[in-house]
Each structure stands twice: as C-alpha cells, then as structure tokens.
Amino acid sequence: MAPQSNRKDLHLDAVLHHDMNMKSKTAGFESVEFEHCALPECDFNAVDLSSEFLGHSLALPFLISSMTGGAKDAEIINCRLAEAASEMGIAMGVGSQRVSLEDSLHSGLGKTIRDLAKGVPLYSNLGAAQLMDKQRFDNAQRAVDFIQADALFVHLNPMQEAFQQNGDHDWIGVLKSIEQLKQRVDVPMIIKEVGFGISGVVAKQLVEAGVDAIDVAGAGGTSWSAVEGYCQTDNKMQRAAELFRDWGIPTAKCLEQIRGQYPDLPLIASGGVYNGLEAAKAVHLGANLVGQAGAVLKAATISTESIVEHFEQMALELRLACFGTGSANLRALTQARRL
C-alpha cells in the first residue's frame, strides 16, 4: 500500500477520534450579527434556498468538502457522501486523488461514486504540489476522468506539507503550473486551501492566473497543523505543530477580503462552518456555496441517512436565518441588515 494511503488512514483516525480543532481561533462569524426583522414579509416555508455554482443548479448552497481521498477503508464513507449529496441536491468534492492515481485498489474512490452522485456536481481533487510532477497535466485529466468530475479542485496546503514527514517543501513555480494547467484541463478549476485560508493578495494572483473559482477554506475548524503533529514521530515537529495549531486566516476575513475585490468571482466558504446560522453569515459575506468536511465526517461513518439528517438540520437553520432577516432568498440574504 502506498505511504500516502497509510498517512490518510492516520488523518482519518485523528479527526474522528481526537480533538484536532483550533484551540482559540474561530472562523470569525461571531463578528457578524444580523438585525432581527419583525416584519419579514415572506413565507417561511417558501424561502428559496436554491443556488447556482459554475453552471449547475443546486437545491441548497452546500458542498461536501474534500476529505478521505486516500484511506483504504474510506470507500464506504465516500459512497455514503455521494448518496447523500444526490438526495439533498448539493455538491460534493472528493479528497485528494494522489493515492487513486498511484494505487486505485486502496484509493477510497471507486468509479461508482459518479453513479451515486446522481444529478449533482462532483469535483475532482489534486494537490498543488503535485503540479510540479512531469506528468502533472496528464494526472490532472486522469483525476477528472476517473470520477467523471464536473470541475477540478487544486488544493494549496504548503503549511500542512511543511509539517508532514516527507512532505512537499519546494513550492517554487506552483503558481505558474496552476496557470498552465488551467489552459489544459477541460473542466472548470477551483483553487482551495485546507484550513489556513486564502488572502485577498493570493486571490488576486489566482484570478490573474485564470482560475474559475476559489474555496477560501479558512481557519477556525480543523487544524491541519495539529493533524500532522499527531502523525509526526519527530519531537521537534510535534512541538512546532502545536505552536502553529491556530495558524491561518479566519474564514470570515477571507470572504471579506476576496469578495470586496471580486464581486462576481464564484466563492466557496469552508473552514469552521458548523451550523446553518454560520452558513447564513457566510452567504451574507459573499459565499456562493458553503462547504463542510469534518462536521460531516462523523455522520458519514454512521450512515447515508445520518448525513442527510445533518444537512436537513443545516437547511432548517439557514431557512430560519433568512426568515428572521426578512430574506426570501439567498440573494436577499446578502443584503440583510446587521447590527
């Protein structure tokens, strides 16, 4: 089995069975407080929560964010996630496909995932560091073709790699490779972080490189410094990982920086979004979709029904936030008054 697959198993164990969240840093949504509207002038049951992203219509503005792409026992989790995404009418991004390209038997990603995610967008996923490989363009297209993806996530995770044993430490030329890949791949390309956030400055570089969308994947949820520290055997790196446990830009700050510069850029908010009220705040700050990974993972270990129940609760809370602000739809929510 590939070493990357072993590491993914450790990641899964860390997130499921240990506290890997940031200690004191939040996603920043507590700074957004809606003004209550006592005359909403809309029907609670008719509030429209539908959304559109990269040409696909969704029943709800939710994304099952990338996770469990390489663990050998993860296929059942991914199948449940795909089934739930189809039932709820939401998008799904798979975890890193680096392992599936090297060892398809232990990838956690069967080709049936496309059949299970019926009628909803499915997003492929590769690490930006792998774009430095000689076969990078072929690998990217293979990743897309392997699951018949509707778009390709490329994840930026330099700090995570820095804490990994045998991680990819040379990031010179990554931006140029992103620009070149955009010209070669035949689906939209979304750039995401993994929980440290994308700043307005980096977003500008990515937009100029031609990317189609950005997932800010900000700080406030799972700390990948902590996760990699858990996987480390080197004492110095373990201590450093704990020191950097709260490193990153809060998700709300990322949204404010990027949406202020690019009013029309498709944006995903993920990182420390735990409930429908926080999802409403993310939409208010400019997110077109709201992604969750760790918050969904425990439900995914139980059943498809548990995942569906999770997103039904999220949808109820989002609907309540819309109604409480007098917002008949998500577009109106972006203009809701704040205290």
UniProtKB/Swiss-Prot annotation:
Cofactor (UniProt): FMN; NADPH; Mg(2+)
Gene3D superfamilies associated with the record: Aldolase class I
Entry's localization field: Cytoplasm
Gene Ontology cellular component terms for the protein in this record: cytoplasm
Catalytic activity: isopentenyl diphosphate = dimethylallyl diphosphate
Positions bound to substrate: 7-8, 96-98, 160
EC number: 5.3.3.2
Main localisation: cytoplasm
GO molecular function: FMN binding; isopentenyl-diphosphate delta-isomerase activity; magnesium ion binding; NADPH binding; oxidoreductase activity
Sequence positions that bind FMN: 65-68, 96, 125, 192, 222, 293-294
Keywords: Cytoplasm, Flavoprotein, FMN, Isomerase, Isoprene biosynthesis, Magnesium, Metal-binding, NADP
Binding site for Mg(2+): 161
Cysteines paired by S-S bonds: none
Family statement drawn from the similarity comment of this UniProt entry: Belongs to the IPP isomerase type 2 family.
Record's function text: Involved in the biosynthesis of isoprenoids. Catalyzes the 1,3-allylic rearrangement of the homoallylic substrate isopentenyl (IPP) to its allylic isomer, dimethylallyl diphosphate (DMAPP).
NCBIfam families membership: IPP_isom_2
The name this protein goes by in its record: Isopentenyl-diphosphate delta-isomerase
Record organism: Vibrio campbellii (strain ATCC BAA-1116)
